[in-house]
Amino acid sequence: MCWRPLCRFLWLWSYLSYVQAVPIQKVQDDTKTLIKTIVTRINDISHTQSVSAKQRVTGLDFIPGLHPILSLSKMDQTLAVYQQVLTSLPSQNVLQIANDLENLRDLLHLLAFSKSCSLPQTSGLQKPESLDGVLEASLYSTEVVALSRLQGSLQDILQQLDVSPEC
């Protein structure tokens, strides 16, 4: 009689441990799909093809460049900066991309949680001091450079997800 609860518990535990492994792979797949979707959206904006992600533009040094090895924390911080820059732009082209970045950051937080990592909250990031001045002086260049660098960063993140990044 006392074996019955133990057997139920073991059966339930085996079920729960199996169920838990599947969603993490789904989250990782969803993350990769969303990255590919964002890259496609950037490609659909025709004027982003005219600038290299490596090109230096005065005043835009706060926009992250390419990072070959990224942790989940660094990915989140980088995407937070891009999200902040894109939401500061008045262009209608980038609104959906900024929303997609928020969703992508949420997926990265789920991946980090599955690895028992805690990502620092970056929602209250201060806007870079030079952003307003740069937006007034060269709105078009800021959008082009930000989207070009974001595309490169997303490609790096996509590659890192294949090798299971650290916290």
From Swiss-Prot:
Compartments, record wording: Secreted
Main localization category: secreted
Signal peptide: 1-21
UniProt xrefs under Gene3D superfamilies: 1.20.1250.10
GO MF terms held by the record: DNA binding; hormone activity; leptin receptor binding; peptide hormone receptor binding
Keyword Membrane in annotation: no
Disulfide bonds: 117-167
Biological processes, Gene Ontology terms: activation of protein kinase C activity; adipose tissue development; adult feeding behavior; angiogenesis; aorta development; bile acid metabolic process; bone growth; bone mineralization involved in bone maturation
UniProt keyword Secreted, yes or no: yes
Entry keyword set: Diabetes mellitus, Disulfide bond, Obesity, Secreted, Signal
Annotated disorder: Defects in Lep are the cause of profound obesity and type II diabetes.
PANTHER family linked: LEPTIN
Family, similarity comment: Belongs to the leptin family.
Known function: Key player in the regulation of energy balance and body weight control. Once released into the circulation, has central and peripheral effects by binding LEPR, found in many tissues, which results in the activation of several major signaling pathways. In the hypothalamus, acts as an appetite-regulating factor that induces a decrease in food intake and an increase in energy consumption by inducing anorexinogenic factors and suppressing orexigenic neuropeptides, also regulates bone mass and secretion of hypothalamo-pituitary-adrenal hormones.
Protein name (record): Leptin
Species per Swiss-Prot/TrEMBL record: Mus musculus
Name of encoding gene: Lep
